[in-house]
Each structure stands twice: as C-alpha cells, then as structure tokens.
C-alpha cells in the first residue's frame, strides 16, 4: 500500500475514531462517579448538590443527555427535549437525566450555567440534573467536546440507543418511538 493510500485511509477513519463514544447497546454505561458538585437537589426552594454515580441510572426508562456547558451544545438536541416535553411521558416510569459538563463551558460562564440549571429544576422537578465540573463523563465516555450526546436507557439501565452529536429529525422520531416501546 502506498503512502498516499495510507494517508487517505487515515484521513477517512480519523473522524470516526475521534467521535467514537463508549456506549454499547445492551450494556450499562461505563461507570462514573461525580463528586465535585454532582446531582442538583431542590428541597423546599433550597438548592444543594450531592454526589452522583452512574449506578443510579436504573429503575426508570430514561434519556441520558450529556451536554457541554454552552448554549451551542444545548441547542444541538433541543428538538428532542421539546418532543419529550410534548409527549408528557409518565414521571413514575420515565426520567430525563442531563449531565452538564461545566468544565467545557466558556470561561467565566459556569455561574450562569448553574443558574440556568436551577431554573430548569424548578420547572421540571422530576428531571435529574447533574453538574460535572471536572469533565468526568466526557473523558470516561470518550465524548466530543462542545457537543451533546443522547443515550436511551431501559429500566435496567442498559443502553438501547446512543449518539454523540446533533440528532436528525428522523433520529428524534426514532428515539421517541423507542421510548414509547420501552414504556409499554
């Protein structure tokens, strides 16, 4: 194989390897624990944080969303979040878990990101918000920086579908259909 062919092949395969996440269908997400900040808790109008780990992703069907702490990342899969809100999924059997990587935020914006999460927690108290100040999930799951990943988990916490990056309208529909199937 000539050097030119090897170089061309490398250029073609490199983007696929760079965006390869660590989620395997039928398996649990690779284990992580977030001790700096962690899960945002709302109790009697008071916010606090508690340690969170991925072993807690059992018991409900869920969409696990990992997003960089920047508006551009949040917007990548806003269509899916709107579809989930519109579907009015049963809170006793479904939960959205959002992990926000504030380590991947525009410098100085972390306070604003946390304020936005607090507002969302008040609006959607049944949803779970995790603040990852050190980028633990990003590294362990090999996700793209400045992006948004979506993982659908069954009630046993096993991956049913995953993508790192913006979802197409067809993929949003595929996720919604899968959620309805898993909730039956």
UniProtKB/Swiss-Prot annotation:
InterPro entries noted in UniProt: YtfJ_HI0045
Key words, A-Z: Periplasm, Signal
Protein location: Periplasm
GO cellular component, as recorded: periplasmic space
Pfam families (UniProt xref): YtfJ_HI0045
Keyword Signal: yes
Chief location: periplasm
Signal peptide, first to last residue: 1-20
Annotated family: To H.influenzae HI_0045.
Name this polypeptide is given: Uncharacterized protein YtfJ
């Amino acid at each position: 194989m000539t050097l030119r062919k090897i170089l061309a092949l490398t250029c073609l395969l490199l983007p696929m390897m760079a965006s390869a996440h660590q989620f395997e269908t039928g398996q649990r997400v690779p284990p992580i624990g977030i001790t700096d900040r962690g899960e945002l808790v709302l109790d009697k109008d008071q916010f606090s944080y508690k340690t969170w780990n991925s072993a807690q992703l059992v018991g409900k069907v869920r969409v696990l969303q990992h997003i960089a702490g920047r508006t551009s990342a949040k917007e990548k899969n806003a269509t899916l979040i709107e579809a989930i809100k519109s579907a009015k999924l049963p809170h006793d059997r479904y939960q959205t878990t959002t992990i926000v990587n504030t380590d991947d935020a525009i410098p100085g914006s972390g306070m604003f990101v946390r304020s936005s999460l607090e507002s969302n927690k008040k609006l959607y108290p049944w949803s779970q918000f995790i603040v990852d100040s050190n980028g633990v999930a990003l590294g362990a799951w090999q996700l793209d920086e400045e992006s948004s990943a979506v993982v659908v988990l069954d009630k046993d916490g096993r991956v049913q579908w995953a993508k790192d990056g913006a979802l197409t309208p067809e993929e949003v529909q595929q996720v919604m259909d899968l959620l309805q199937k898993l909730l039956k």
